[in-house]
A protein has these predicted regions:
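Glycine- and acidic
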Residues: 29-31, 147-154, 261-269
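Extended, charge-rich alpha-helical segments
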Residues: 272, 279-380
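Metal-dependent nuclease catalytic cores that hydrolyze phosphodiester bonds in DNA/RNA
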Residues: 1-141, 186, 274
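Short, polar/flexible loop-turn hinges at active-site or ligand-entry regions and domain interfaces
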Residues: 27-36, 57, 154-157, 178-179, ...
Length: 380
């Protein structure tokens, strides 16, 4: 039996439905046309998932469940992308069944492998989710903690796995009581990490004291405020998780003694790479701006959105004008060289936080390399 305070249950249930809707909408709708289309799509997928689950728990084989999901996607959800619907429903159903050991083991194992292959469509993990949507449960089937990808395309992906686990553990250690029985929990990280992420996160959580968690989160908050790592080296915790606009709320939370009163929405940081690039373009229009940091290869890395093809030829980069950086999804556009003029540091205030990127600024014919650490703002 999972022992958890009533207020904590309320917090989790409160964001359960919105989390499902948030996770099941396509990126192009996010923050664009409001939540109407998102809600319609999410509600439809959720209802279909419940229908499949109700049929699955009667004892259907894995093959029949898969066939049923395909049928539902092609009939009830035919106006939406098949892959998005199929893998969202399959993930939901498989994890619920797995928790209760009611599913064909081979089917579940196959499903986990499929998740890794298609992680960009699983529960919308190609988006950066709000923190208030990072923990939710399906009330009838026990708790299911889904930690969305807390990193953005602007963060170095290669060495973030441990830190994502650690950050998750820090949050959980404050959200739940110290005598928490995590039996029955599934913690699913959509980053291509490990299959034993649940065990590692719970181990971290059980070992972290409240004092230690607050200290580490305070260091993170300090890093977000100053753009410098308070721990003495570049912090790989994603500063975009909480956002500069929420630092004061975070600090208040860390310093508060009444964790039960925490409102998860206060830590909300809404972020979409397209919005960031829109803001970037508005701030840079008609001004000189180019990326100076090209990484170890000394070349820009550019990818088309479809197929993620890479170019390392600078002329091709200038021609395509899409600078992608280290992210996985989306594309970044720069102005054509013909439009490059002057760019001043004042324009940085309108840009989003983009760690580990440098820009080349021209001031009265003098080029200066600046760290690109502008203030995070809500551009919507």
């Amino acid at each position: 039996m999972i022992k958890i305070s009533a207020s904590a249950v309320h917090r989790i249930k409160k964001c359960a439905h919105s989390a499902f809707l948030e996770s099941s909408m396509p990126r192009e709708w996010q923050y664009r046309d409001g939540y109407k289309q998102q809600a319609e799509r999410g509600t439809a997928i959720h209802a279909a998932a419940e229908d499949v689950l109700n049929a699955a728990i009667t004892g259907l084989s894995g093959a029949k469940i898969t066939a049923l999901i395909k049928k539902v996607c092609k009939t009830k959800l035919k106006e939406y992308a098949f892959d998005d619907c199929f893998y969202t429903i399959k993930t939901y159903v498989s994890y619920v069944l797995k928790t209760h050991k009611q599913a064909d083991k081979n089917w579940i194992d196959t499903d986990i492998a499929v998740e890794e292959k298609h992680r960009k469509t699983i529960l919308g993990c190609d988006m950066v989710a709000k923190l208030d949507a990072s923990i939710f449960c399906f009330a009838n089937f026990g708790f299911y903690i889904h930690i969305f990808d807390l990193k953005t395309g602007y963060i170095d992906y290669e060495a973030t796995a441990y830190d994502q686990l650690r950050f998750t553990a820090l949050l959980l250690s404050l959200l739940f009581p110290k005598n928490m029985d995590f039996k029955g929990f599934t913690i699913h990280t959509v980053q291509p990490l490990y299959y034993d992420a649940t065990k590692q996160i719970i181990t971290h959580t059980e070992q972290i004291t409240t004092k230690q968690a607050r200290k580490e989160l305070a260091e993170l908050a300090e890093f977000v405020k100053t753009g410098k790592c308070a721990m003495g080296s570049h912090c790989r915790f994603c500063p975009c998780v909480l956002g500069c606009k929420s630092v004061n709320d975070l600090v208040d939370f860390i310093n508060s003694n009444e964790v039960e009163n925490m409102d998860m929405s206060r830590l909300e940081y809404v972020y979409d790479s397209r919005d960031a690039i829109d803001a970037f373009m508005r701030a840079c229009e008609g001004k000189l701006i180019e990326f100076a940091d090209r990484g170890e290869s000394g070349k820009y890395e550019v990818r088309e959105k479809s197929g993620h093809k890479k170019w390392k030829d600078e002329k091709a980069v200038e021609k395509s004008l899409r600078i992608f950086g280290d992210g996985i999804y989306g594309k970044r556009k720069l102005l054509s060289p013909a439009k490059m003029e002057k760019f001043t540091s004042d324009d940085l205030s309108a840009l989003y936080e983009t760690p580990k990127v440098k820009i080349l600024v021209k001031k009265e014919n003098v080029f200066e390399v600046l760290d690109f650490h502008p203030i995070a703002t809500d551009q919507r």
